[in-house]
């Protein structure tokens, strides 16, 4: 079984998650590869899909959304999972006591859920390299504001055991048996 882990990443955090998922699926004996969503022109050759994108201001990166929209008929008929990365920091609940991962689901997921019926969706914490240069207008503006510099937590907040566990669930859903071999 051939699995594509397509991703849209601005600073590399989501790419790292996608590569880890593909590696973990491979450790279960599945043929999986991670590729930037914008570069995929041959989606029909894959049997299953995991599509991920970074989320900013409750929106998935456009390359992830565009990949799903362009391939929606194919994704609707084959096993598909969606993920997002983006929440930053160590807090798992917000000031109102709500689960951060549940309240940061990209707005696009509701529409995509109706169109392609993914088997599951997941939100993972992301990462921000303090040395990374801002990308895009909004990031540049926030980085120039005195309060903006401290408003965004810096560091790697990705939960690798949670990412591995989700990849293991996907592998088992696709018929892989036993634990990951790597």
Spell out what each predicted region is.
Residues 34-44:
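Short acidic low-complexity segments
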Residues 2-30:
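N-terminal beta1-alpha1 ligand-phosphate binding loop
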Residues 16, 24, 28, 33, ...:
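FMN-binding flavodoxin-like domain, especially the glycine-rich phosphate-binding loop
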Residues 3, 53, 152:
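Generic anion/oxyanion-binding catalytic loop in active/binding sites
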């Amino acid at each position: 079984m051939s699995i594509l882990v397509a991703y849209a990443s601005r600073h590399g955090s989501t790419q790292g998650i996608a590569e880890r998922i593909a590696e973990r699926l491979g450790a279960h004996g599945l043929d999986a590869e991670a590729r930037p969503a914008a570069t995929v022109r041959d989606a029909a050759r894959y049997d299953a899909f995991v599509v991920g994108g970074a989320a900013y201001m409750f929106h998935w990166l456009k390359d992830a959304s565009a990949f799903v929209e362009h391939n929606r008929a194919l994704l609707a008929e084959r096993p598909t999972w969606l993920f997002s990365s983006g929440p930053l920091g160590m807090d798992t609940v917000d000031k109102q006591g709500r689960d951060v991962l549940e309240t940061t689901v990209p707005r696009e997921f509701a529409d995509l859920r109706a169109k392609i019926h993914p088997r599951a969706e997941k939100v993972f914490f992301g990462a921000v390299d303090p040395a990374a240069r801002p990308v895009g207008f909004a990031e540049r503006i926030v980085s120039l504001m005195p309060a903006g510099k401290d408003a965004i937590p810096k560091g790697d907040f990705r939960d690798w055991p949670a990412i591995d566990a989700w990849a293991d669930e996907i592998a088992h859903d696709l018929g892989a048996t036993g634990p990951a071999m790597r």
